[in-house]
Amino acid sequence: MKDLVLFVCVGNAGRSQMAEAFADRHGLNASSAGTVPSAKVNPVVVEAMKEKGIDLSSNKPKMLTTEMVNQASLVVTMGCSVEEVCPRPMLSRMQKKLVDWDLPDPKGKPIAEVRKIRDEIENRVMELSKSP
């Protein structure tokens, strides 16, 4: 089984959902979660991903668990805007390989901005899929 890449953000409603979907598309073993999961995936994110042929409409945000972190060989945090719920400090204490992709949260942004975030995530996931 391939090493697991875990994508983590606060709500698991946008960035980490897109990253997991692109990772799956590019042959990575991936999962995603949030420290304070939203009720649903951001509808603008669903629309932006549909343009790439990826359907997130049935995805549900997931709560980050210690078990998820323990199973991952790499944890990618997606930038934090709310310090109290940022996953990075907690994850740093768990001695995992940790990378932060400082990306803006698509929440409340128009589709044009969400597309830019989506494309940046896809580019970073493609780079990740090429690394050993």
Model region roles, listed by residue range:
Residues 1-9, 26-27, 53, 73-74, ...:
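Solvent-exposed, well-ordered amphipathic alpha-helical segments
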Residues 84-132:
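Phosphate-binding/catalytic loops
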Residues 76-78:
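Redox-cofactor binding/interface segments in oxidoreductases and associated redox assembly factors
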Residues 38-41, 82-86:
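Short, charged/polar "capping" segments at the starts of alpha-helices
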